[in-house]
C-alpha cells in the first residue's frame, strides 16, 4: 500500500485537486465580492483650451457606482451652469467665460440604498497650447483597442466604467495612405479565429471608404486626407465575428476626431465697412464694428481666434492715429481729438484680421469713416422784421415766410430749423412749420381770426435746430406784425340751436317762438332778413323782419317728420352786405302730446274657426303718450255684437271671439276702443271664419259678409238691386221703340203756287251778286266733325268730295263734281239735314223772283241749265224750263 501512495501519479493527484479547489473557491469569492457604491474618485479635473466655452460643450465624464443594477444614475450639480447626463458626461448648459480662473462645484448622486455621495469637479483653462501645423498626434493615440471583457463577475461593472478614448487624426496629413490609426483586438482571438469589420460614417455610409479595417489583423486605417472644415468627427462601430459569422463581441464605438490645421485665413463679412462719427467727438466714442470669420477651430486651438488691428489711416491728419480698434471685438473708436468736418470730412482705414491671436494668417478690409456735422452754428433770421395781412375767419392761411441761414451742412439735423412763437400768439391763433426743402418758416393762421375782437397781432418767433447746440449760444429771434382785414361775416343765431316746447294742437297762425340772429359786423350796420331754410312738413312761417315763427298748419307729434317728438327746422338769416352772407340756426320744436289719436287694434284682420274657436288676441295701438293711453275700453258697434265678443286683456291687448257659430266667410267687425281720457276710435276689423274647429289653419276664404247682417238680409238687398236694374232696362227699351214721324220731303202737287214755296229767306239782293266765292263754306265738307243722326250709319264707303280749289276759275268744275258725288251717294237722305250759309247782307227788296231779271219779259232767260242740276232741282226746271213748250 505504501508503494501505491508513493507512486508519482498518486503523489500528483492531491496537488491537482487542491489547485482545482483553490481556483473554484477563488472564482466563487470573486463572484460573491460585494458592490462598493460611490464615485470612482473624490475629485475630477477638466480643462478647456480657452476662457470662452460654448454652450453644450462636453468637458469630461465622472464615474459612479450606484449598485442598483442600472448602467446610469441621477446626478445633481451645485452649479446650474453645468449639467451631468445619466452616463456621467459633464457639459455646459450655456456659454461660459473663465476669465483666467478655475470653476469648482460639487456633484451629488444616490446609490441603490438612497445614500448620498459627492465628488468635486474643477474646470480650468489648459495653458499649454499646441498649434498643430504639420506634426500629428499619433503618439497620443493608443496603439491597440481591446473589446471590453465579458466575464460574468465583472460584466456589469466593466460596461459601466469602460470609456473608449477618442482617436485623433490631423487634417491634411501627407500620408502615405492608407495610414494606420489603431488596431482593434478581441480577447477571443486566442480561442478561435476572429474577423473584424467597421460600420458608420466614413466606412459604409457617405463618405464611403475613408476608413477601412484589415479583416484579420484589426488595423483601422484612413485612406485619404481629411478636412476638418467639412467633417470634424467620425463615429464608427467595430465588429468582431467568428469564422462562422457569429458575433464574439458586442459592437464597440470608435470616435475619430479630426485635428485642426491652420489652413484657412480670416474672411471679413464685407469688403468695405462704412461708419459715421460726429465732429468734435470725444476719445473713446465708438464709430463702428468690423467683423471677420475663420473656418478653423477656435475652441481647441488658436487657429480660429481672430485678432484685429489698423494698418493705415488716410488722411493722416490732424495726426496719424485718430482711431483705434479692439483686437478681440473689432470695435473702432475715436482715439484722438480734433475731428473737424470742415477740414476732413472722411477717413479711410485699412483694417487687418489675423488668426492664432495675431500670429497666423491674415486678411484686410477697408473701413470708411464719415465725419458728420455737429450743431456748432445756430440758424439766424435774415431779415428779422416781417409783416403780413390776412382776412378774418380764414384758418390755414399763410401769413408770412421767415428765412434763416445756417452754416451747418444742408439737410443734416444740425441744419434743419425748428420755429417757435415765443410771444403774441393769443389763444393759439397762429402756427409755424418748417419748409423741409428751403428750411424757411411758414407762418399760418391756426384758426379763424376775428377782426371785431382783435385786428392786429405782434408776434415774436425764435428758431433752433433739431439737435441741441454743442455750445451754449443765444437763439436768433424775429418780429412779425399781422394785420387782420374785416370781411362781411354771416349773421349768427343766438343760440345756434334753439329748443322750444310747444303743444301739438297749437292753433294755426299762433306764435311759436322768436328766433333772431346778430350781425358780427357791428360797424357795417347791415339789415338782417329771415326765411325758412328747411321745413320738411311745411308747418312754420318766419317773419322776414322780426324773426317771429308762427304755425301755418296744425302740428302733429305723431308725424313722420317729428322724430322722438322733436321737429327740426332750419332758419336762415341773410344780411344785405356786398356780397350778402347767410347764417344758419336750428330750431327744435319739442312737441307736447295731446290726446288727438284714438286707440286702434292691430292687426286688423284675423282667421278663426267656426266651431269651438280660440279667441284672437290683437294689440291695442295708441299713438299718443301716457296718460292719454291705457286703461282702454272696448265695445262693438253697428250690430257686430250679435255675432262677436270683445274684451280687454292686460294693458294693451284685445281678445275677440265668436258669440255663436257662423257660416264660413269674411265678416266685418266694428270695434270701438276708448282710451283713459275718453278718446274713442271705431275701427273695422276683418275676420275670416273658416270651416274648422279649434285653431284656424289653411283657412279657405268664402264670400264677404258684413259683421252684423245675416244671409236673408243680404239676399233681400241683392233682390231689390236686381229689380231696380230690370225696371231701368224696360224703360230704355220702351223709349227706343217709339215711332218717329217724318215730314214729307216736298209739299204735295196741289200746294204749288205762283212763287217758289217753302224756301227760307237767304237774304241779299242785286247789290250782293258780286262777292268772293272763296269765302263760301262748303257745308258738311267744311264741318267733318258734324255727325248726321237722321240716317243709319252707311255700310259702304262714303263718296270722295273734291276739296275747294285755290283758283277761282275752277269753281265751276268744283261744284259740278261735288254735285255728281252727292247725287250718287247712296247714304244721302232726300234732303240736306244741315246747311251752313255765309252772311250775304241785308234783306232783298224784291218781292218775287221775277224781279231778278232786268228785262221786262223773261223771254231772254234760259233756264235749261236747271235740268243739268240733278234731281234736287227737277221741280224748278219743270216750272221754268217748260214755258215755251206751253206757248
From Swiss-Prot:
Extracellular side: 161-714
GO annotation, biological process: adherens junction organization; calcium-dependent cell-cell adhesion via plasma membrane cell adhesion molecules; cell migration; cell morphogenesis; cell-cell adhesion mediated by cadherin; cell-cell junction assembly; homophilic cell adhesion via plasma membrane adhesion molecules; synapse assembly
Tissues in which the protein is found: Expressed in the liver.
TM regions (residue ranges): 715-735
List of residues binding Ca(2+) 3: 294
Summary of subunit composition and partner proteins: Homodimer. Interacts with CTNNA2.
Descriptive protein name: Cadherin-1
Native species: Gallus gallus
Amino acid at each position: 500500500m505504501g508503494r501505491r501512495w508513493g507512486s508519482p501519479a498518486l503523489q500528483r493527484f492531491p496537488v491537482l485537486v487542491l489547485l482545482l479547489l483553490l481556483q473554484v473557491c477563488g472564482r466563487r469569492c470573486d463572484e460573491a465580492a460585494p458592490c462598493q457604491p460611490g464615485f470612482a474618485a473624490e475629485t475630477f479635473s477638466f480643462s478647456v483650451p480657452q476662457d470662452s466655452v460654448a454652450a453644450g460643450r462636453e468637458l469630461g465624464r465622472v464615474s459612479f457606482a450606484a449598485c442598483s443594477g442600472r448602467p446610469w444614475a441621477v446626478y445633481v450639480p451645485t452649479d446650474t451652469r453645468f449639467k451631468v447626463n445619466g452616463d456621467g458626461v459633464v457639459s455646459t448648459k450655456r456659454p461660459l467665460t473663465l476669465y483666467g480662473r478655475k470653476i469648482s462645484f460639487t456633484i451629488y448622486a444616490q446609490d441603490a440604498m438612497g445614500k448620498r455621495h459627492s465628488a468635486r469637479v474643477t474646470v480650468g483653462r489648459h495653458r499649454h497650447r499646441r498649434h498643430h501645423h504639420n506634426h500629428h498626434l499619433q503618439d497620443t493615440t493608443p496603439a491597440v483597442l481591446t473589446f471590453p471583457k465579458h466575464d460574468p463577475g465583472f460584466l456589469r461593472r466593466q460596461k459601466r466604467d469602460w470609456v473608449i478614448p477618442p482617436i485623433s487624426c490631423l487634417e491634411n496629413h501627407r500620408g502615405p495612405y492608407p495610414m494606420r490609426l489603431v488596431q482593434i483586438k478581441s480577447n477571443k482571438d486566442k480561442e478561435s479565429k476572429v474577423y473584424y469589420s467597421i460600420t458608420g460614417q466614413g466606412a459604409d455610409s457617405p463618405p464611403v471608404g475613408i476608413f477601412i479595417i484589415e479583416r484579420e489583423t484589426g488595423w483601422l486605417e484612413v485612406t485619404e486626407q481629411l478636412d476638418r472644415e467639412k467633417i470634424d468627427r467620425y463615429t464608427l462601430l467595430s465588429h468582431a465575428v467568428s469564422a462562422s459569422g457569429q458575433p464574439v463581441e458586442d459592437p464597440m464605438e470608435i470616435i475619430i476626431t479630426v485635428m485642426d490645421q491652420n489652413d484657412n485665413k480670416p474672411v471679413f463679412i464685407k469688403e468695405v465697412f462704412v461708419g459715421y462719427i460726429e465732429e468734435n467727438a470725444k476719445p473713446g466714442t465708438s464709430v463702428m464694428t468690423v467683423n471677420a470669420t475663420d473656418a478653423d477651430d477656435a475652441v481647441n486651438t488658436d487657429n480660429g481666434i481672430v485678432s484685429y488691428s489698423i494698418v493705415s489711416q488716410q488722411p493722416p491728419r490732424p495726426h496719424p492715429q485718430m482711431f483705434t480698434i479692439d483686437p478681440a471685438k473689432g470695435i473702432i473708436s475715436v482715439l484722438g481729438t480734433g475731428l473737424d468736418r470742415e477740414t476732413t470730412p472722411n477717413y479711410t482705414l485699412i483694417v487687418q484680421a489675423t488668426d492664432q491671436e495675431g500670429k497666423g494668417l491674415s486678411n484686410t478690409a477697408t473701413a470708411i469713416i464719415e465725419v458728420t456735422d455737429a450743431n456748432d452754428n445756430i440758424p439766424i433770421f435774415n431779415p428779422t422784421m416781417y409783416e403780413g395781412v390776412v382776412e378774418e375767419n380764414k384758418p390755414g392761411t399763410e401769413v408770412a415766410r421767415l428765412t434763416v441761414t445756417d452754416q451747418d451742412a444742408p439737410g443734416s439735423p444740425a441744419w434743419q430749423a425748428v420755429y417757435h412763437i415765443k410771444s403774441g400768439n393769443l389763444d393759439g391763433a397762429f402756427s409755424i412749420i418748417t419748409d423741409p426743402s428751403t428750411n424757411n418758416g411758414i407762418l399760418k393762421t391756426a384758426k379763424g381770426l376775428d377782426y371785431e375782437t382783435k385786428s392786429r397781432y405782434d408776434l415774436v418767433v425764435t428758431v433752433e435746430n433739431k439737435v441741441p447746440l454743442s455750445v451754449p449760444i443765444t437763439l436768433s429771434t424775429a418780429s412779425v406784425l399781422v394785420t387782420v382785414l374785416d370781411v362781411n361775416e354771416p349773421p349768427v343765431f343766438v343760440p345756434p340751436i334753439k329748443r322750444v316746447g310747444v303743444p301739438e294742437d297749437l292753433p294755426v297762425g299762433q306764435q311759436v317762438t322768436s328766433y333772431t340772429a346778430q350781425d358780427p359786423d357791428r360797424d357795417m350796420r347791415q339789415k338782417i332778413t329771415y326765411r325758412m331754410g328747411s321745413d320738411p312738413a311745411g308747418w312754420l312761417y318766419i317773419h322776414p323782419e322780426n324773426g317771429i315763427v308762427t304755425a301755418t298748419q296744425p302740428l302733429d307729434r305723431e308725424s313722420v317728420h317729428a322724430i322722438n317728438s322733436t321737429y327740426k327746422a332750419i332758419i336762415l338769416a341773410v344780411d344785405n352786405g356786398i356780397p350778402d352772407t347767410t347764417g344758419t340756426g336750428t330750431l327744435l320744436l319739442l312737441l307736447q302730446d295731446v290726446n288727438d289719436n284714438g286707440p286702434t287694434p292691430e292687426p286688423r284682420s284675423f282667421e278663426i274657426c267656426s266651431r269651438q274657436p280660440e279667441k284672437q288676441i290683437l294689440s291695442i295701438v295708441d299713438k299718443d303718450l301716457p296718460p292719454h293711453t291705457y286703461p282702454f275700453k272696448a265695445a262693438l258697434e253697428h250690430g257686430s255684437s250679435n255675432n262677436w265678443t270683445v274684451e280687454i286683456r292686460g294693458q294693451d291687448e284685445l281678445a275677440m271671439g265668436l258669440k255663436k257659430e257662423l257660416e264660413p266667410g269674411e265678416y266685418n267687425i266694428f270695434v270701438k276702443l276708448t282710451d283713459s281720457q275718453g278718446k274713442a276710435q271705431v275701427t273695422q276689423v276683418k275676420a275670416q271664419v273658416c270651416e274648422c274647429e279649434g285653431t284656424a289653419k289653411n283657412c279657405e276664404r268664402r264670400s264677404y259678409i258684413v259683421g252684423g247682417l245675416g244671409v236673408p238680409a243680404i239676399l233681400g238687398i241683392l233682390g231689390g238691386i236686381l229689380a231696380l236694374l230690370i225696371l231701368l232696362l224696360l224703360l230704355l227699351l220702351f223709349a227706343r221703340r217709339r215711332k218717329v214721324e217724318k215730314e214729307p220731303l216736298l209739299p204735295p202737287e196741289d200746294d204749288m203756287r205762283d212763287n217758289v214755296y217753302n224756301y227760307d229767306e237767304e237774304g241779299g239782293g242785286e247789290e250782293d251778286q258780286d262777292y268772293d266765292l272763296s269765302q263760301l263754306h262748303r257745308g258738311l265738307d267744311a264741318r267733318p266733325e258734324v255727325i248726321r243722326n237722321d240716317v243709319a250709319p252707311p255700310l259702304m264707303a262714303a263718296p270722295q268730295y273734291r276739296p275747294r280749289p285755290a283758283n277761282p276759275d275752277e269753281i265751276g268744275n268744283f261744284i259740278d263734281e261735288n254735285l255728281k258725288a252727292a247725287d250718287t251717294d247712296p247714304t244721302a237722305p232726300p234732303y240736306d239735314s244741315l246747311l251752313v250759309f255765309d252772311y250775304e247782307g241785308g234783306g232783298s227788296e224784291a218781292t218775287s223772283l221775277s224781279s231778278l231779271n232786268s228785262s221786262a219779259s223773261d223771254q231772254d232767260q234760259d233756264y235749261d241749265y236747271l235740268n243739268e242740276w240733278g234731281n234736287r232741282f227737277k221741280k224748278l226746271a219743270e216750272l221754268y224750263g217748260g214755258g215755251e213748250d206751253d206757248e
